[in-house]
Amino acid sequence: MKRLVPGLLLACLLALPGTALARGQGWSILAADTLGRGNTAFSGQIGWPGLTLGVLHGTSEKVDIGGKFSFNWGREGWVRHTSPGIKLQGWLRVELAKTNSVSFALTFQPGPLFYFDDGDTDVGLALPVAFVVGIPVSSALMVNVGLDMPFHVYFGRSIGPVIPILVGGGLEYFIDSKLAASFNLRMGPALIPDWDESEFAMEALFGIAYRF
C-alpha cells in the first residue's frame, strides 16, 4: 500500500505527452511550487487526523514562510488512537529546483504540540521535514509525490521520540488562478523507540487554498 500511491501517480505521469507537463498555475500549497515574492495564501485542510488552518507568504521566488494551527482528533495520524490535541507550527518551504515539467522542494514545520488523554496532557515538540516533488499535469491540475518525516518528541515520562516515515501523493485542482481544492495522502510506520514498537500513521486531508 505504501508504494501504491506514488507508483500509480508516476505511471500516469509517464503516460502524458511532454506538452501536457509544461503548464500549471505557477504556485501550490501542497507541492513544490512556491507562491512567488509578495504573494500570500490562506489554506485549510480537514480529514484524518484533524483540521489544519495555515497562512503562507512568499518572501522570495524560492522561499515561503508562514504558520499553521491544527486541531487533531487522531494523535499525529495514528489510526488506532483518537486523542484530541493541538499544534502550533511555523512553516518554511524552500524550492530546490524547477523546470517546466517538475519542481522539488523541502519543507520544515516546527512547533509545540499538546494532546489530552484521560485527564493527562502530553506536551511535545514537532520537528517535521519533508521532500516533495510537484508535477503540473495541466493548467488546472498539480500532482505531488512526497516523502515526509514528521518527527516529534514528547517530554516527561511519556511516549518519547516518534519517527514516522510516510510516503504518498496528492492532487491540487485549480478552480481559477487564485483558488485551489486539494486532496493529500501520506501513510507509513511511526517508529517509537522507547516502546520498541511502531504504529501505522496516515494523513488523508481534503483542502482549499486561496492566493492573493
List where the protein language model places each region.
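Cleavable N-terminal export/targeting peptides
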Residues: 1-28
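Short hydrophobic/aromatic segments of transmembrane alpha-helices and their interfaces
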Residues: 4-5, 46-47, 162, 208
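Short glycine/proline- and aromatic-enriched beta-strand/turn motifs that initiate or cap beta-hairpins
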Residues: 19-74, 209
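Short beta-strand-initiation
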Residues: 8-9, 39, 50, 166, ...
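Mid-chain, structured segments of secreted extracytoplasmic proteins
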Residues: 68-110
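Outer-membrane beta-barrel transmembrane domain signature
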Residues: 26-33, 96, 100-103, 107-212
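Membrane-embedded beta-strand positions in outer-membrane beta-barrel channels/transporters
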Residues: 41, 52, 64, 87-91, ...
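Short, solvent-exposed coil/turn segments
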Residues: 35-37, 48, 85, 164, ...
